[in-house]
Amino acid sequence: MTLSPPLIPVFPAGYGPLPSDFDTWVQASFGFLTAQVVFRAEMRTTQTLNGFTPILYDTILEDPYSGWNASSHVWTAPFSGWYEVTLGHSIATATVITEAVPEISGTTYEMSEVTCTSSTEGGTGASLLASMVGGIDFVQGVAWTSASVSIDVSSEGRVPWLEVSFISQ
């Protein structure tokens, strides 16, 4: 269910609130504020990475506000506020350095690099708190690697993922 951002209650003189007003002021607002996750995606097919490469998410798990653009692989914020963007991926190549990079409206935010020591160790993740303007700012998951490698989608815990959660206005 898609919920709207909370409205500031208005109390006109001589107006007695109705039960539906309390629903709008209290229940709908709390529902919106506690829902938090506004977008979740995964990639189930393999992709080759080299340098900074946008991750081509192909499985959308949650998108109640219809912000995902499948052709440009970006998610647009539906309303202004603070969001937490988290993402991660795994690679199956040893001795390669990799990094999960959140990108907000074309600006990349590099966090921390991971050097893969074996084909079974190659996961990385990042988290970013960002202020975004509704209908304008967008999020894209990017991976950086020091050499040409493939993303590891061999098991459930290794698939690339992106999650955006609403924090506050």
Label each PLM-derived region with a short phrase.
Residues 95-108:
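Short, surface-exposed beta-strand/strand-loop-strand elements in extracellular ectodomains
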Residues 106, 120-140, 146, 153-155:
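Short, surface-exposed tryptophan/glycine-enriched loops
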